[in-house]
Structures are given as C-alpha cells and as structure tokens.
C-alpha cells in the first residue's frame, strides 16, 4: 500500500546522521552482526538493512529478509543495496503483522526499527516473532513514540511549536485539526509496558536502553514532512498544508528560542528466546 505519496514518506528523515546513530546503537547492543538469518522488519528503503550488512562478522551463508509493506520502498532498497556475492537478500512485500506468512523459515534475529508503535495488536505480533525465532534467536526493536519520549526540558519547545503552527494553519489556510481518535502511533505505551509486552510473549529481555538524543533542526524539519507525524499532530488537515504550517512554525520558534538541538528519548530493547519453552 504505497499511500500518502512518496513525497511524505520517512526516507529523508531515516538517513539523517543522528538517526543512523540511533539504529547503530540498537544493532550493536543486540549484537545482530553475529547472526546468520536476519529479518529487517519494516525495512523501508534499506537504511537499516545496510547497517546490518556492515556489521556481519561473516557474510558467508547469511540470509537477510528485508520486509516492508511498500513495493516502492523495497525497489529502492534493492537498488541501494545491490547484488551481494556471499549472501542472499530477499525482499518481501508484506505488512509486519503478517510475518508468519511472509517468512517461512525460522531466523536468528528479527530487527524492527522505529515502527512497533504503529502496530495495533502488538501482543499478537510479538508472539509471531517469538514463534519465528530459532531457540536462541534475538528480537531487537526501538521506538521514540512512547510515554516519556519527550524529556521535561523539551516541553516548552513543543508547546510553542504546536501553538505557533496551529495559528499559522488557521491564519494562512483557514483550517483547524479535526479532534477525533488518535492515530495508532499517538496511543502510546510506557517503556515498562513495552518490556511487559515482550516478557508476556515468553521472551527474556537482555537490553532495556533509554537513550537521550539531541535532535537538530533538520530532524524536526524532516519529520514535519512525514505523513504519519502530520496526521498525528494535525488530524484531518491536508498533508501539504500541515507540512507547510509545521515547518514554518518550527523555523520561527527555533530562531526565537535560539535552539541548537531539542532532546528526544529512544527506547531500545533486545530480547532472546534463550531458555524459553517451545
């Protein structure tokens, strides 16, 4: 389902250096490079897939499954990654929730970067992931959409940014958000609830990492052009009008507050099937 057009996708944000470091941290904490059969769930245009490839201790006999719901993203990933001699990269068109059907064999590691918050039935997905792992397999994920991801010293920025953007939206476009149900990424779990989710599926948590990241202007500017972000903070507003208002409001507040970065917290979790009962 290639919706909301490629103009409003996550790609430009996903290649920013600070965001790459966030995902590198997860892969290194989970020691994904030691594994042979690896799923990159929600791979997008292949940014994390490339990071996995760079960390492989041995490429021989390695199989990577790059899974995404967007055929356009998978095509871009295949072009970006290219042919590999010693390993196989399989590009799989599927929703994350259909993992059982998308990947037939058991794998050593499943990586899910900054997307688990979108999944409506997270418990069902994590159970699928457990069933798909080999006996000592690893599940690693991160997210910046959880209760507590905004440090207290970022609250003033967000309040001013949203208020200014809403005023711009009303003044320049005569629009206001439609106050309806939240999109799934805005219905947020706490970090502890994510841990409970993993443990309830029968996995053992190995890494529970909260990482404060200083996000530069470019990060907030790019995320303001992402359809899910716009729909989350300005539900019902046309994407082009929402993006324009958010980015204009951001620029004004950034200058007025004389900011260099604004912090956000990423949760990174690695869990193992080790010693769990089949």
Ranges and model annotations:
Residues 4-5, 206-260:
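C-terminal helical/coil "lid" or tail adjacent to the Rossmann-like core of SAM-dependent
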Residues 17-34, 51:
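Conserved alpha-helix/loop element of class I SAM-dependent methyltransferases that forms part
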Residues 39-41, 45-98:
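Class I SAM-dependent methyltransferase SAM/SAH-binding core
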Residues 101-110:
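A short acidic, Gly/Pro-enriched loop at the edge of an enzyme's catalytic core
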Residues 109-122, 145:
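A short SAM/SAH-binding and catalytic strip from SAM-dependent methyltransferases
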Residues 123-135:
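A short glycine-rich, Lys/Arg-flanked "PGG" loop and its adjoining helix->strand segment in the class I
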Residues 140-170:
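Conserved class I S-adenosyl-L-methionine
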Residues 186-201:
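Short alpha-helix
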């Amino acid at each position: 389902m290639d919706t909301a057009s490629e103009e409003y996708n996550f790609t430009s944000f996903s290649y920013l250096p600070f965001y790459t470091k966030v995902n590198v941290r997860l892969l290194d904490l989970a020691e994904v490079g030691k594994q042979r059969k690896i799923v990159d769930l929600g791979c997008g245009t292949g940014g994390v897939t490339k990071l996995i490839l760079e960390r492989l201790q041995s490429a021989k006999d390695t199989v990577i499954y790059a899974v995404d719901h967007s055929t356009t993203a998978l095509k871009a990933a295949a072009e970006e990654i290219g042919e590999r001699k010693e390993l196989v990269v399989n590009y799989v068109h599927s929703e994350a929730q259909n993992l059982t059907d998308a990947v037939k064999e058991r794998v050593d590691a499943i990586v899910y970067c900054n997307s688990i918050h979108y999944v409506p039935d997270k418990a069902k997905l994590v159970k699928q992931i457990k069933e798909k792992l080999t006996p000592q397999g690893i599940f690693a994920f991160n997210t910046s959409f959880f209760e507590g991801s905004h440090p207290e010293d970022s609250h003033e920025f967000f309040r001013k940014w949203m208020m200014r953007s809403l005023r711009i939206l009303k003044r320049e476009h005569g629009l206001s958000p439609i106050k309806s149900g939240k999109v799934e990424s805005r219905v947020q779990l706490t970090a502890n609830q994510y841990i409970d989710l993993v443990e309830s599926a029968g996995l053992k948590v190995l890494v529970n990492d909260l990482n404060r990241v200083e996000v530069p202007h470019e990060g907030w500017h790019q995320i303001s052009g992402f359809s899910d972000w716009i729909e989350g903070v300005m539900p019902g507003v046309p994407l082009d009008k929402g993006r324009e208002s958010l980015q204009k409001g951001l620029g004004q507040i950034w200058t007025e507050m004389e900011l260099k970065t604004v912090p956000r917290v990423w949760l990174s979790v690695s869990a193992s099937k080790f010693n769990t009962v089949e």
